[in-house]
């Protein structure tokens, strides 16, 4: 009986460890302290800015940020393809993204340790949409595991004249044909990817 009880306890312990194990490397919406919150509000970062905390294992060499447009059921690269070099051993950082419309001006900032990079893409010219065009976006809302060489969707934006807009979970980035079926005029995605490969 003691052997059965010990085996049962061991199984419970193993199941509990595997079910509750948090990812070692992850990206999640930033957890700001009061002072950071106040500064963010002062700078307008509580509007179209999205801040994320990043935890790595120290072996990442680059981070790539890409934007895509949905064309015929497939994602086509709009901006990105390059990347930002990370110093060896960096483990904690922050990323910020700011945009109203991914077709227009888009901003990104990457900070690891004392290194900081900020880039602006696109044009600030106003986009002429048909009357009645609406826009909605879904953003990464929880902790997401970082796997090297795998893109992580940060935002999906839909611009459409349709009255009803369905916005799927960000994991549907990997099934773009689902967005194509809905017939929206414009669907965009913003992703990040961490790599152990240096920029070439």
Task: Describe the residue ranges of each PLM region.
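Low-complexity, intrinsically disordered regions enriched in charged/polar residues
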Residues: 7, 21, 26, 33, ...
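C-terminal motif of bacterial Sec signal peptides marking the signal peptidase cleavage site
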Residues: 13-16
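N-terminal export/targeting and maturation segments
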Residues: 19-88
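Residue-level detector of functional hotspots within protein domains
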Residues: 3, 38, 176-178
């Amino acid at each position: 009986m003691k052997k059965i009880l010990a085996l049962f306890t061991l199984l419970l312990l193993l199941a509990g460890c595997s079910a509750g194990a948090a990812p070692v490397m992850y990206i999640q919406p930033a957890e700001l302290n009061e002072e950071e919150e106040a500064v963010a509000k002062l700078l307008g970062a509580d509007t179209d800015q999205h801040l994320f905390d990043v935890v790595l294992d120290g072996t990442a060499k680059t981070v790539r940020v890409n934007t895509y447009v949905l064309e015929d059921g497939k994602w086509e690269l709009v901006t990105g393809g390059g990347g930002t070099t990370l110093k060896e051993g960096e483990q904690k950082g922050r990323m910020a993204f700011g945009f109203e419309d991914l077709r227009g001006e888009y901003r990104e900032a990457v900070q690891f340790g004392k290194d900081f990079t900020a880039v602006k893409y696109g044009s600030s010219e106003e986009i002429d949409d048909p009357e009645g065009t609406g826009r909605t976006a879904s953003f990464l809302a929880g902790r997401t595991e970082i796997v090297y060489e795998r893109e992580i969707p940060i935002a999906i934006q839909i611009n459409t004249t349709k009255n009803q807009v369905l916005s799927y979970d960000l994991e549907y980035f990997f099934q773009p044909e689902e967005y194509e079926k809905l017939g929206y005029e414009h669907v965009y995605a913003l992703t990040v990817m961490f790599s152990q490969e240096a920029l070439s």
